[in-house]
Amino acid sequence: MKTKLREMLKFPCFFTYKIIGLAQPELVDQIIKVIQIQIPGDYTPQVKSSNRGNYLSVSITICAKNFEQIETLYHDISKINMVRMVL
């Protein structure tokens, strides 16, 4: 799968992450903080709450310069304690 994704993308390109995490006030700030380390910029994530309000879905788009940035951010975002899934 990694090879197909790598072949499909032409850099620089926009790439959207969808992150599912616990509905904590600091979740979005933590995600943006991790992204800012790799790719500084202004980010306006789209945030949706689950039906019961236990989880948040955060969609955030970055401009990646290479595939390694996409992979690194995927792993770094996954390490956030409140994050349950990164797509």
From Swiss-Prot:
Pfam families in alphabetical order: DUF493 (PF04359)
Family, as annotated: Belongs to the UPF0250 family.
Protein species of origin: Buchnera aphidicola subsp. Schizaphis graminum (strain Sg)
Top-level taxon of origin: Bacteria
PANTHER family cross-referenced by the UniProt entry: UPF0250 PROTEIN YBED
GO CC terms: cytosol
Gene3D superfamilies linked: 3.30.70.260
InterPro entries per the UniProt record, alphabetical: UPF0250_YbeD-like (IPR007454), YbeD-like_sf (IPR027471)
Protein name (Swiss-Prot/TrEMBL): UPF0250 protein BUsg_472
TM region(s), chain numbering: none
SUPFAM superfamilies xrefs: YbeD/HP0495-like
